[in-house]
């Protein structure tokens, strides 16, 4: 037994020690409370000692009636019942202050007790003070103050009727009549109007005989009453239903302090608030204690273990430490207000989560970096030559999925279920996908370059062939070739991409690569446009339709052929002026290489001038050859008459002699044989050549000297002028004019020879007509002095058979006009 509230209304300092000594602090909620009120010297302490075998101080009969219990005392029996013995009311010692302390004591008893015993003598029922009517009035008012708004169980009021001799029903009715009278005088709040006192209290009545007059009966009834507090199987067991007033034993001392402080300061006593305050304080202490223990263990067993390698036992150890901390907290906090305990438990869980979260993130990051490193090594080992591989991107994506899955599984295996942690793997997924994309882009780019370079070798050869031929449809052929090559290259690349990628297509730069390649070949070919023009001119001018060397005939229109060949050469120049690689009808962007200017106007004029200068020589040579043929084939009619008259005797001789006829028939047979074997033309050509030479010699001897003298200077002058031009071209060092220069030189030599022969012929004619010489002289003329000239090959020289003769004056004038016209165009 110990005093907890002294007579000065102060909480005793020994309260905590006493509660700890009787085991309340470790009892949790496994105890019950009751208090007793009543008038002073009414035997309250004696009753408690008899009921619960306590040792409360009782009144000494030898000293007389006086105040025995001062303040509030407490005792604890073996049945875990904490009993409060409250100072009696209506005491002489307190006098007028009795009402104030009486109210405070009533508040305390109702606040802490599950059952409030009212000690009442039967003989005092019906009296005002003796029957504790003022005290009961205080109990009613205090109860309304404390519990009117709460949903706690009703307060149990046990009226113990001492020294009872009347039937219980009569006593109960009398007490209830007094209670009803008291309740009518209590001012009820607005929300409690119409309520009865039975709505707030559970009334119990128990009668005890006189202690001294009937001690055996008293002990018997006292034991029965005591069993109703201690025996759970006893009918009418007072603590059968929890009343919500119990405070966990470890917080009882603090609760008593807070309640009594509020009572002493006359503050409104809000028991639910007091319990919440106590619960908040105690649960906070429990949470701090559990967290401190957890922090120590987690630092040693988890935080220190996470280093360069993933800690695979994170979840197992973390879960165990977390559950231990929560279990330790629950063991102590669950005895307090549930909402407060749950709130503090949640707070503790959040603190534990916050402590472990950095370690969780770090552990997952270490695993993520390890997985990322392995994935990078895998990607680096993939082949870069897509031509030799299959399903490149599919394999990379599969590896990516496996990597992300392994990270997710590790995160799940590490995460504690109670904690809503998040580990973002989207960044690594983006990074690894970017790595795949970059690696694949590089591999595709290199593959496209390899395919292009391989195909471009043959492509350039085909393009060069088209550019070299320079046909009129050159640009159409170039566009077609470029379009087909782009299509084929794109198709080949697309087949490779289908094997190695999911949804990749050839790059648009493939077309640009072929654009640049084609344009480069065109640029290179444009450096030789003049040569192409000359070759095209010579193909049309120096070759016939069968692409054989042209043999000029007297009736050939050289001017028309020349102009046609020249137009063919100029067509090449026109084709190479601007690029026409872009498809007709398509939009033309700025700075388009497919439609760019290839030749500037200055370069074009330069090429045109040099081209005209070069082809003029071919024209002059052709005209000279034609004129020589006219001279060869022009035999006068009178010459044929002379031959017929001179050969008459030979014809008669052939007729008169049969063997000559046979020879003639043999000759005819030979001719037929040659004709049937397609050799006649060749023989005729050879024979005709020899006959022509013979006839030319005869004609040369018979032509007029005057005409020959007029023609010779003109031929000589033209030959010298041509030779001078040839020498000028030779001095310029133009290699591409070498063949033409040789032809011109041969022409000059031929013309010079013709001039010399004409002069010799004139000399012979003059000597024949000279009067100093006899026409019948048989002495042969002296042979002319041989000329030391360069021998000209006749195999490829069309002028080798040219013989000196008279050239038509009109043709020479036409040649002169054409030369002057070319010179005017040049300037």
From Swiss-Prot:
Transmembrane segments: 635-655, 659-679
Any one Gene Ontology molecular-function term assigned to this protein's record: GTP binding
Biased composition (Low complexity): 753-772
Matching PROSITE patterns: G_GB1_RHD3
Domain GB1/RHD3-type G: 28-242
Domain of life: Eukaryota
Residue ranges, annotated region (Disordered): 745-827
InterPro entries: G_GB1_RHD3_dom, P-loop_NTPase, RHD3/Sey1, Sey1/RHD3-like_3HB
Biological-process GO terms, alphabetical: endoplasmic reticulum membrane fusion
Name the UniProt record assigns to this protein: Protein SEY1 homolog 3
Lineage: Eukaryota, Metamonada, Parabasalia, Trichomonadida, Trichomonadidae
């Amino acid at each position: 037994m110990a005093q907890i509230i002294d007579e000065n209304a102060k909480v005793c300092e020994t309260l905590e020690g006493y509660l700890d000594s009787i085991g309340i602090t470790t009892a949790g909620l496994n105890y019950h409370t009751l208090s007793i009120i009543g008038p002073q010297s009414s035997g309250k302490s004696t009753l408690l000692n008899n009921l619960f075998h306590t040792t409360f101080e009782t009144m000494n009969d030898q000293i007389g009636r006086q105040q025995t219990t001062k303040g509030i005392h407490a005792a604890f029996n073996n049945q875990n019942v904490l009993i409060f013995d409250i100072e009696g009311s209506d005491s002489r010692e307190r006098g007028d202050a009795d009402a104030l302390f009486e109210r405070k004591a009533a508040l305390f008893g109702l606040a802490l007790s599950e059952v409030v015993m009212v000690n009442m003598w039967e003989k005092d029922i019906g009296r005002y003070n003796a029957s504790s009517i003022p005290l009961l009035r205080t109990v009613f008012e205090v109860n309304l103050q404390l519990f009117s708004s709460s949903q706690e169980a009703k307060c149990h009021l046990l009226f113990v009727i001492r020294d009872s001799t009347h039937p219980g029903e009569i006593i109960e009715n009398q007490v209830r009549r007094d209670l009803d009278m008291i309740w009518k005088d209590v001012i009820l709040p607005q929300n409690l109007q119409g309520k009865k006192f039975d709505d707030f209290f559970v009334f119990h009545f128990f009668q005890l005989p006189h202690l001294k007059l009937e001690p055996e009966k008293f002990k018997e009834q006292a034991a029965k009453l005591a069993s109703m507090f201690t025996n759970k199987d006893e009918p009418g067991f007072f603590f059968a239903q929890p009343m919500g007033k119990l405070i966990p034993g470890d917080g009882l001392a603090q609760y008593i302090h807070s309640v009594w402080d509020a009572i002493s300061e006359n503050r409104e006593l809000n028991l639910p608030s007091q319990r919440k305050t106590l619960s908040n304080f105690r649960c906070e202490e429990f949470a701090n204690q559990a967290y401190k223990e957890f922090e120590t263990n987690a630092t040693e067993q988890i935080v220190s273990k996470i280093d360069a390698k993933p800690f695979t036992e994170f979840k197992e150890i973390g879960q165990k430490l977390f559950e231990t901390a929560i279990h330790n907290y629950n063991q102590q906090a669950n005895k307090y207000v549930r909402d407060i305990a749950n709130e503090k438990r949640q707070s503790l869980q959040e603190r534990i989560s916050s402590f472990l979260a950095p370690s969780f993130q770090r552990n997952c990051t270490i695993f993520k970096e390890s997985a990322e490193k392995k994935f990078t090594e895998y990607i680096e080992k993939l082949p870069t030559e897509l031509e030799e591989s299959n399903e490149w991107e599919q394999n990379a994506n599969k590896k990516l999925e496996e990597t992300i899955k392994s990270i997710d599984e590790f995160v799940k295996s590490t995460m504690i279920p109670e904690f809503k942690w998040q580990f973002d793997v989207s960044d690594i997924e983006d990074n690894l996908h970017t790595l795949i994309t970059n690696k694949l882009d590089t591999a595709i780019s290199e593959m496209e370059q390899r395919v292009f370079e391989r195909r471009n070798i043959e492509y350039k050869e085909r393009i060069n062939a088209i550019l070299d031929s320079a046909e009129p449809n050159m640009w159409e052929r170039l566009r077609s070739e470029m379009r087909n090559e782009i299509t084929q290259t794109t198709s080949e690349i697309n087949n490779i991409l289908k094997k190695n990628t999911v949804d990749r297509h050839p790059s648009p730069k493939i077309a640009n690569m072929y654009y640049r390649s084609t344009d480069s070949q065109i640029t290179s070919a444009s450096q030789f446009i003049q040569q192409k023009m000359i070759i095209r001119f010579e193909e049309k001018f120096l070759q016939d339709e069968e692409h054989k060397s042209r043999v000029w005939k007297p009736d050939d229109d050289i001017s028309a052929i020349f102009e046609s060949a020249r137009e063919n050469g100029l067509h090449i120049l026109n084709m190479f002026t601007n690029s026409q690689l872009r498809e007709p009808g398509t939009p033309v962007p700025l700075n388009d290489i497919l439609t760019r200017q290839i030749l500037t106007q200055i370069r074009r004029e330069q090429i045109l001038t040099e081209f005209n200068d070069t082809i003029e020589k071919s024209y002059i040579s052709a005209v000279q050859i034609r004129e020589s043929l006219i001279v060869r084939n022009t035999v006068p009619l009178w010459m044929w008459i002379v031959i017929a008259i001179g050969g008459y005797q030979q014809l008669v001789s052939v007729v008169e002699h049969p063997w000559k006829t046979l020879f003639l028939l043999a000759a005819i047979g030979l001719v037929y044989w040659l004709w049937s074997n397609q050799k006649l033309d060749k023989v005729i050509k050879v024979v005709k050549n020899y006959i022509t030479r013979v006839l030319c010699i005869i004609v040369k001897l018979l032509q007029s000297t005057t005409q020959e003298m007029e023609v010779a200077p003109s031929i000589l002058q033209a030959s010298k002028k041509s030779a001078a031009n040839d020498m000028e071209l030779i001095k310029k060092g133009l290699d591409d004019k070498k063949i033409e220069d040789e032809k011109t030189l041969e022409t000059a030599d031929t013309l010079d020879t013709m001039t010399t022969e004409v002069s010799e012929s004139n000399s012979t004619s003059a000597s024949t007509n000279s009067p100093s010489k006899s026409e019948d002289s048989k002495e042969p003329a002296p042979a002319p002095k041989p000329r030391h000239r360069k021998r000209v090959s006749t195999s490829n020289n069309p002028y080798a058979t040219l013989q000196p003769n008279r050239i038509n004056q009109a043709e020479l004038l036409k040649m002169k006009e054409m030369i002057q016209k070319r010179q005017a165009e040049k300037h």
